[in-house]
Amino acid sequence: LYPIGENGGSQKLLIQAAKKGRIRVEMSRRICQDCGKESPNLICHNRNSEGEVVECGGKTIERKSRGSNSRRRRGERTTVDLDKLLEVKRRLLGLDRLPEFIKAQKELLSEAQTPEPIEKGILRGKFGVSVFRDGTSRYDMIDVPVTHFKPKEVHTSWKKLYELGYEKDVFGKELENDEQILELFPQDIIPSLNAEEHLIATCNFVDDLLVRFYKMEPFYNVKTVHDIVGSLAIGLAPHTSGGVLCRIIGWTAASAGYAHPLFHAAKRRNCDGDEDSILMLMDGLLNFSKHILP
């Protein structure tokens, strides 16, 4: 979620815009509390000298606009040395080269017009992850209500389900095989296997973001969809602003998302076959921001 104006072509590609060197775009005007220089970012990107890779890293505060107070958006026309900025970010992230396909925006639609850290876009491009306008990566599925299931139907072993709290079947017998019928917990979900590629890529992106940008340990360590079982996610209807916490317990071959009627109703008041989305919880915690919403 970084503005490049008309410089990125019809696909709004960051690398294509960077070939022009300097670009002029509308972004927030902020002042670093450490070095006193202007930076459009929440964390100052300025360097002491051109040859250095280390950035200031100080927190910035919004500067009073020089324009009219009647404008809905508070950004101002700013010159960005995009090619130099991307090269510095590449070196800071420890990448050999930048991904070719990094999508950007023509303009920022939020009130303050504060951009996301450009590093997030670079790492999304590395894993081919799309981004919604709130900073998260979502996968849409049709809602299908389900109340009971068998372990073999959700591609999860009964032993794994036992670890997740499914200790007894509907008849009160101890869970000990894949043929027993279990009652679905209200906040457990069974997404479509069609989401496999997207969710694995999102988990890998989040781990890379934690390691390269936040300098922390990876969280998901995912290689297959079975590694995602037990992970927390957020269910969200497109017309509401409140997500509902859920847990992934298995997968379905259907092109739909199976979940308890109470879960679907919590998202949108009913469960009559509408389409909602899920996003990984850590993605939401790291990347969602009300400040970048239109």
Task: Give, region by region, the residue ranges found by the protein language model.
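Conserved core architecture of multi-subunit DNA-directed RNA polymerases
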Residues: 1-294
